[in-house]
């Protein structure tokens, strides 16, 4: 995506806090939004994966988790469709949300089936000590939407979200576009899902992703296989 703008491929809005329940599952929501956007852009497939499954697989509990742990859980346990393990209106207790724990054999099998079809990789783009974060992020946006850690949320008089240099982060979401020298565009999973951040926003951590569909190789019969099959047929 040479212009770094993934806005046409963003998934449907899903909130991490519903039914009066805060899930603390922002690392799963932010990561899956990036994955769903990337798959839609590369393969034209609209997916909606279960953040509950990913949170359980990653061992997420209040007050949250590391995006790196979440990504490694995806590489180990895969993903499943939201409809298989949804965040329904009946779930209003944290122990209900993060259940079943451990995951059932059926859910694990569904996740492993996804791994048979997709190759998922991830890598850090920005650390707190990274120099020229703006260049690193704008370059990385050519290849995927970016999972970013942020300090949620403080607005200035222009309606842009700000963060002082060195402030700690407490949230994780999706960076999907930028205006050079002006603002960063964020897709969030709280109210006001589309946010603009000041250009010199001091992101703490940022991670890019890669998705590749695994081609199923079907071995073609050799000449000798065909010959054996031919004689087998005529000898019947």
What are these regions (language model features)?
Residues 31-35, 169-172:
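Short, hydrophobic/amphipathic alpha-helical packing segments
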Residues 1-27, 32, 38-60, 79-109:
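Active-site-adjacent structural segments surrounding the nucleophilic cysteine of cysteine proteases
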Residues 1, 235-236:
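Intrinsically disordered, low-complexity terminal tails
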Residues 60-233:
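Predominantly the structural core of cysteine protease catalytic domains
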């Amino acid at each position: 995506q040479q212009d770094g703008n993934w806005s046409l491929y963003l998934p449907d809005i899903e909130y991490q806090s519903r039914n009066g329940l805060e899930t603390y599952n922002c690392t799963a929501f932010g990561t899956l939004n990036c994955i769903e956007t990337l798959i839609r852009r590369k393969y034209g497939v609209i997916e909606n994966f279960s953040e509950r499954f990913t949170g359980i697989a990653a061992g997420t509990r209040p007050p949250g988790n590391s995006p790196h742990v979440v990504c490694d859980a995806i590489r180990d346990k895969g993903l499943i469709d939201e409809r298989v393990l949804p965040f329904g209106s009946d779930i209003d207790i944290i122990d209900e949300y993060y259940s079943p724990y451990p995951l059932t054999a059926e859910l694990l099998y569904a996740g492993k089936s996804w791994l048979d079809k997709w190759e998922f990789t991830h890598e850090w783009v920005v650390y707190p000590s990274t120099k020229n974060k703006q260049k690193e992020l704008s370059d990385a946006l050519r290849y995927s939407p970016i999972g970013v850690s942020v300090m949620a949320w403080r607005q200035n008089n222009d309606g842009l979200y700000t963060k002082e240099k060195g402030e700690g982060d407490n949230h994780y979401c999706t960076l999907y576009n930028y205006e050079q020298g002006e603002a960063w565009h964020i897709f969030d999973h709280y109210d006001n899902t589309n946010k603009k951040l000041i250009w010199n926003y001091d992101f703490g951590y940022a991670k890019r992703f890669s998705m590749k569909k695994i081609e199923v190789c079907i071995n073609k019969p050799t000449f000798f296989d065909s010959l054996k099959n031919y004689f087998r047929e005529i000898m019947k």
